């Protein structure tokens, strides 16, 4: 089990990052809420991970805090929720916001996320209510750990912020027309990819 990775952040293309640890590059998929908290390229980061072994692949999912990872682990234990949908849920809202949805029985917000229909949302609210009791306090005071050391200069990004944002939304399950419309509606000159992704997601919730 790989539970934590500490290394140099050498690639960032939402929702995936590449971290160099002693010459070995680890590809890690992250929810966008954690992705936003990452340091710049060339700096060192600590990422808490969940390791999944499948017949055709070995996958690492990464989180900025232990509490967010704990919530992800609870989510994928829910009926009908796999790692991909778990990442989508935590990309559309923070751990704290998800806890608030469960507390309020807020189906309307959950069904706005791609891949979450009414039945899935109802099932999530029922199954997660008891599981979250021990997690709620921890998620409010989540620790965020970064180790920033390096003078590495990152190469210039090839893709535009709009292209990056649309690609990130497509990876979360949004349709091309939805992604393009959301990005276009919030884009202003000078926006970074991360700010644009965050704004586009908020516009759809």
UniProtKB/Swiss-Prot annotation:
Biological processes annotated in GO: DNA recombination; DNA repair
Pfam hit, one: RuvA_C
Chain intervals for the UniProt region annotation (Domain II): 65-143
GO MF: ATP binding; four-way junction DNA binding; four-way junction helicase activity
Alphabetical list of CDD domains matching this protein: UBA_RuvA_C
Keywords for this protein: Cytoplasm, DNA damage, DNA recombination, DNA repair, DNA-binding
InterPro entries linked to this entry: DNA_helicase_Holl-junc_RuvA_I (IPR013849), Hlx-hairpin-Hlx_DNA-bd_motif (IPR003583), NA-bd_OB-fold (IPR012340), RuvA (IPR000085), RuvA_2-like (IPR010994), RuvA_C (IPR011114), RuvA_C_sf (IPR036267)
Domain of life per record: Bacteria
Location(s), subcellular: Cytoplasm
Stretches that traverse the bilayer: none
One GO term describing the cellular component: Holliday junction resolvase complex
Region of interest (Flexible linker), ranges: 144-156
Region called Domain I, residue ranges: 1-64
Similarity section: Belongs to the RuvA family.
Oligomeric form and interacting partners: Homotetramer. Forms an RuvA(8)-RuvB(12)-Holliday junction (HJ) complex. HJ DNA is sandwiched between 2 RuvA tetramers; dsDNA enters through RuvA and exits via RuvB. An RuvB hexamer assembles on each DNA strand where it exits the tetramer. Each RuvB hexamer is contacted by two RuvA subunits (via domain III) on 2 adjacent RuvB subunits; this complex drives branch migration. In the full resolvosome a probable DNA-RuvA(4)-RuvB(12)-RuvC(2) complex forms which resolves the HJ.
Function: The RuvA-RuvB-RuvC complex processes Holliday junction (HJ) DNA during genetic recombination and DNA repair, while the RuvA-RuvB complex plays an important role in the rescue of blocked DNA replication forks via replication fork reversal (RFR). RuvA specifically binds to HJ cruciform DNA, conferring on it an open structure. The RuvB hexamer acts as an ATP-dependent pump, pulling dsDNA into and through the RuvAB complex. HJ branch migration allows RuvC to scan DNA until it finds its consensus sequence, where it cleaves and resolves the cruciform DNA.
Domain remarks in the Swiss-Prot or TrEMBL record: Has three domains with a flexible linker between the domains II and III and assumes an 'L' shape. Domain III is highly mobile and contacts RuvB.
Listed name of the protein: Holliday junction branch migration complex subunit RuvA
